[in-house]
């Protein structure tokens, strides 16, 4: 996962805006986690409507007030704001555990093209190794809430068991008949391919077609 941000700086959305400026720091922050790439902009009405839902989703999975142990989840805000001031204003009330790219980093645009983002808001969910689980994260978060995290986690386990201890792999019971459907829905695509999901919409209000 760290290779996606190789040579880049990620910033923590805390009061000090601590920088993760080495590959080791980025790796420690992202390793063995599902990573949400959140493409949004403060001036986008659809983003403003979605953000409270996303914040609640993230906090309920990572804040010890709600859970005994924070979920293996990280979020990187990939700003599509027009100015750095708009980006700062948008992040002001966002969770402090969020990460974001510096405004001057062109990777903000490159990631939009790489993952075929066509409208805002968009949430691309990545496995710990950088493979794509789904590009429809925003829709699933709105429909399913925190329950979709368990779906994503299970889909990641299908391939690499990143969320299980070695002893958990022994004597496992057969999975349900619906597993094949989940595998199909959450088919793994190499992040470098940047292909489109079937049925992915475009050209709607809030579209990001001109941003990338």
Swiss-Prot record:
PROSITE patterns: THIOREDOXIN_2. Keywords: Cell projection. One of its GO terms (molecular function) is receptor ligand activity. Gene3D superfamilies: Glutaredoxin (3.40.30.10). It is found in: Cell projection, Cilium, Photoreceptor outer segment. Its main location: other. InterPro entries: RdCVF, Thioredoxin-like_fold, Thioredoxin-like_sf, Thioredoxin_domain. The keyword Signal does not apply. GO terms for cellular component: photoreceptor outer segment. Interacts with isoform 1 of BSG. It holds the Pfam family Thioredoxin_8. Residues 191-212 are annotated as: Disordered. Residues 197-212 have a biased composition (Gly residues). Belongs to the nucleoredoxin family. One of its GO terms (biological process) is photoreceptor cell maintenance. This is Nucleoredoxin-like protein 1. Plays an important role in retinal cone photoreceptor survival. In association with glucose transporter SLC16A1/GLUT1 and BSG, promotes retinal cone survival by enhancing aerobic glycolysis and accelerating the entry of glucose into photoreceptors. May play a role in cone cell viability, slowing down cone degeneration, does not seem to play a role in degenerating rods. Residues 1-164 form the Thioredoxin domain.
